[in-house]
């Protein structure tokens, strides 16, 4: 029995250690370092080009800005449910928009609804994802080239990318005005 408890304890500790290193600290091993990075969107001069499988063609952003709040609730409560997001996405598409801009990491309900909507539609909505910038820093004696400001912005940008690719977990309050969880 002692051997069983010791083995289970070691396994639990290893799982917690892996979770902390991979999802919280963002440490991971690239098993394919030589793999070419591919993308379906790029820029040339002042044009945005999108590849839908038939080569790169010019893409015009027709977008809608979306926050995380709903009337009667605090925006940090992330009170919008999946059905509401799906309804909004339909309405946004009906407006003729093809892109949604969000200003910071949302909760998992948004990303799950966004994935579901795009997965079920041949003409998807695209996402422009922002990174929250501290207003105090912007309006104080510091500027965008201040080392501490720049380092924080760079770290938060990396965190957003890692969260969106399912490589990092964040908790409410880790980033200003951010949701929580991992999304993939």
Positions of PLM-derived features:
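Active-site-adjacent substrate/metal-binding segments within catalytic domains
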Residues: 26-119
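Hydrophobic alpha-helical membrane-insertion segments, chiefly the h-region
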Residues: 14-24
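Aromatic-lined substrate-binding rim segments of carbohydrate-active enzymes
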Residues: 82-145, 159-165, 174-182
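Alpha-helix N-cap and loop-to-helix initiation/capping positions
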Residues: 80, 144-155
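Ligand-binding clefts/hinges and TM-proximal coupling segments of bilobed small-molecule sensing domains
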Residues: 169
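N-terminal Sec-pathway targeting helices
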Residues: 1-14
């Amino acid at each position: 029995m002692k051997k069983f408890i010791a083995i289970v304890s070691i396994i639990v500790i290893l799982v917690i250690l892996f979770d902390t290193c991979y999802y919280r600290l963002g440490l991971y091993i690239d098993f394919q370092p030589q793999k070419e990075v591919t993308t379906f969107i790029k820029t040339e001069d002042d044009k945005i080009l999108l590849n839908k499988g038939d080569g790169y063609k010019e893409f015009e952003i027709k977008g809608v800005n979306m926050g995380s709040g709903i009337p009667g609730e605090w925006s940090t409560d992330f009170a919008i449910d999946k059905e509401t997001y799906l309804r909004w996405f339909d309405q946004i598409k009906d407006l003729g928009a093809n892109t949604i801009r969000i200003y910071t990491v949302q909760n998992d309900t948004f990303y799950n609804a966004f994935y579901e909507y795009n997965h079920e539609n041949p003409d998807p909505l695209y996402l422009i994802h922002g990174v929250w910038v501290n207003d105090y820093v912007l309006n104080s004696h510091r500027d965008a080239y201040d080392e501490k400001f720049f380092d924080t912005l760079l770290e938060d940008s990396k965190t957003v990318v890692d969260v969106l690719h399912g490589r990092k977990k964040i908790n409410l309050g880790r980033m200003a005005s951010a949701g929580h969880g991992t999304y993939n």
